[in-house]
Amino acid sequence: MKFPIKTIRRGGQITAFPKNSLEVSKLVKFSNKYKFHILPIGGETNRVDGTKPQFEKTILIDFKKMNRIEEVDTDNFIITAQSGTLLKTIQKAANNKKLLFPVNIAPSDKCTIGGNISTNVGGLQTLRYGNIEDHINGLEVVLSDGTILNFLNKLKKDNFGPKLWKLFCGSEGVFGIITRASLKLIPKKKYNSTYLIQTNSLNKSIRLLKFLRNKYFDNLTSFEIIFPIPSSYLFNESAHHFNLIIEIQSNIIGNYKKDLKKYFNLNEFKIDKIEHDKSKSWIWSKREELVYNQIKYNFTEKFDISLPIDKWSVFIKKVNKFVKDNKIFTPYFFGHLGDGNLHCNFKVHPNSKKNCAYLSKFIYDLTIQSEGSVAAEHGLGLKKNYLLKKYKPSENYLFIKKLKKHLDPNSRLGKNKLFQA
């Protein structure tokens, strides 16, 4: 048995480092012939065990060497890159041409564009720019039989058949392996204003979001919320403030701080501070600390959900009542209020499977009752693969399974990811 490209052993698995789509295709054909499972590996920043091997007879396709930016086309505002290219590298390449690739998530220096697309990431600027699917112009993918499908193009208008590449965005690699991407760029705004605001109420935070969204719709790029308990860890203060991080981008210099103060005075807001540009990097570094603090302080049960913004207040009230009634859970909430994505995390006392299962059922049931999604931006992976069958309408779930059976009849690609095989 001779592998089509050089491989190494990592634990019980075999790891291959292809340099192009043809080598990926050869690996997939080899895997079919010798009955190996296939697992693509990007930056390994996935939080739901999406890159965790399950079977000893698995080929890990590591995309480290497929990290080339092929073209930055400033006429058509398109950047084309291999799927192992880091998100940060793509952002820098766009910036060098005074353009912007607006998808931005915390581990941008570690995550790869292929992994970002396979989970359809959102991130810190989804409020204004949407998820990564909104910035894809086309993909190249390798199917489970080794067929290479090239959907790359630079066209704004192209109705020459359905956009089949969309099947591979957000499907976590179970329908095919993304090898290259054509991505949309936009002109970079000249000015960027960042504010750290403290208030004492979730409802006031939501009202402020509505005001800013109506007044600065095209310029409001981020509206992050940090609830009192994580705020107390970040800023060494008593746990009663909500901290908001607001970012406004524009081609015109605006005195947004003056507008904010005027709004606060008219609406009798109790605002403790507004920090404008207190080092933008410092403000965003505090936001990134949230992820590390939840690990540091043992908030081990994590829920990545999204809710309609008008449902947030009632949802939080019900969760707080649940916490108060049970006395074994401590909440740690933060999220992207602007796009409805709530990171709803908990410390469990004592941490037992029974208590964690009880908590999970409550949170997920309440999310669905609130017209939300139980998987906002991290995907399902292996860790949450039971959710699709439980919470998707049965017709939708069966349709997804039919697609999987048709595109990957032997279930070689990411078996048990998204749903249990």
Where are these regions (language model features)?
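N-terminal accessory segments
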Residues: M1-K6, K33-F36, F264-K280, Q369-V374, ...
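FAD-binding subdomain of flavoenzyme oxidoreductases
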Residues: R68-E224, L413
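Short glycine/serine/threonine/alanine-rich loop segments
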Residues: F36, L99, I328-F329, G372, ...
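N-terminal flexible segment immediately upstream of the FAD-binding catalytic core
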Residues: M1-K29, N46-F77, A106, I226-L234, ...
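Activity-critical C-terminal alpha-helical subdomain
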Residues: T147, N385-A421
